[in-house]
Amino acid sequence: PNIERPLSYTAKNAYTKNYEPKITLAPGKTVSFDAYIVTGVPYYKNFASANVQDIAIKYLKCTAELPENPEEIKNASFSFVDDLTTKIKEGTVLSIGFSPDENNIFTKQNHFEIGWCGQNAMFARLMLEEYAENGDKHKLETAVSILDTWLKARLNNGLMYICFESIGSSSHISDMCNLGYAAAEYAKCFRIAESLGLSKPEWLDTAIGICSFMIKNYSDGCGFGKAVDALTGDFVDTKGTVGAFIIPALLETYKETKNKYT
């Protein structure tokens, strides 16, 4: 079942010939496989894969152990987010990561992305959840600052700059992955803020703006497309399935607006 065809996606925007491994048997030779059929009720809502993973570990007798417990891993993750946190004149953003320079010294990149690899909005939501659970005010303040800072990336047509450092550019391509993450996470963050007694209607407005643009420009031929010029609203790439990232955004925003025409 491990097949990619008709082409294989092997690098950024690069396709190569299909990946389709085969087993060749000599005359008279045989091969056998074992398979397991698993039934049951998911331990966690919408996460049945957790059952499959636990059963696989049990029956395949996996002996590997986590080097750290889940709490240590979570704390290490938030520590890394602290390292990514960048103060700029407009507020707070998260760097996309660290890369080696010409001397192979890892330095923080001055590249800030709302979703996809940068995940500014998602990390902000995780910090809000951590505050709600453990009362860490530093995480609350950082999350709110990140989300409020990114409001400056919004455009009048409902879209937004997906790279903060590109604000003010005469042309900016926004892909559906970033826009989908942005809208979905802003809707979730609005929901969490409401539960914490924080009034952040502009967060929900950001999600509504993106979703409204997508619904207005939906095409039966290419769905939501892949990428759009955020300033003109013209679609520059309509191929592929990246537009599917808009679906979670629509669902999360609908939960708050109850408006099927959001």
Describe each model-derived feature in a short phrase.
Residues 13-24, 102-120, 166-181, 226-245:
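Solvent-exposed loop and edge beta-strand segments that line ligand/cofactor-binding
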